Regions:
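Terminal alpha-helical segments
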Residues: 1-129
């Protein structure tokens, strides 16, 4: 559960780490974070529609409160990501792009570690039953 999404996130991170342009690095790092968020939602979300629309970061904060700080951080980068995707590339410095790549990698690693731990606990509890 979530491995495919985390694999796609790792691929986006690998692309971000080798991209030359700051804007491309920024976009790929944000894409990686979105893919990690999708893996969290796949692992945790229950089909309980509330009737109101929410973005991925709101959902992550709701279904996995331990990642709420990450969700808030990446939600705060959303407007800049949209501007860069629309072609306003000069607003992202190399430093900002590097920082976002590093943050997306840290988010990925934390989610991967927690999901692996949850799978181990689930496997052990099913063995005991």
């Amino acid at each position: 559960m979530g491995d495919d999404g985390l694999g796609r996130a790792r691929a986006a991170l690998a692309g971000a780490e080798v991209a030359d342009a700051a804007a491309e690095r920024y976009l790929l790092a944000h894409l990686a974070a979105l893919r990690v968020a999708a893996a969290v939602l796949e692992a945790r979300a229950h089909a309980t529609p509330t009737g109101r629309l929410r973005n991925v970061w709101q959902l992550v904060g709701e279904v996995a409160p331990e990642f709420a700080e990450w969700a808030g951080f990446f939600a705060a980068t959303q407007a800049k990501r949209q501007a860069v995707a629309a072609g306003v590339t000069a607003i992202v410095s190399h430093r900002e792009a590097d920082d976002l790549v590093r943050d997306a990698r840290a988010f990925h690693d934390e989610v991967a570690r927690r999901l692996a731990g949850a799978r181990r606990r689930s496997w052990h509890s099913s063995e005991a039953g």
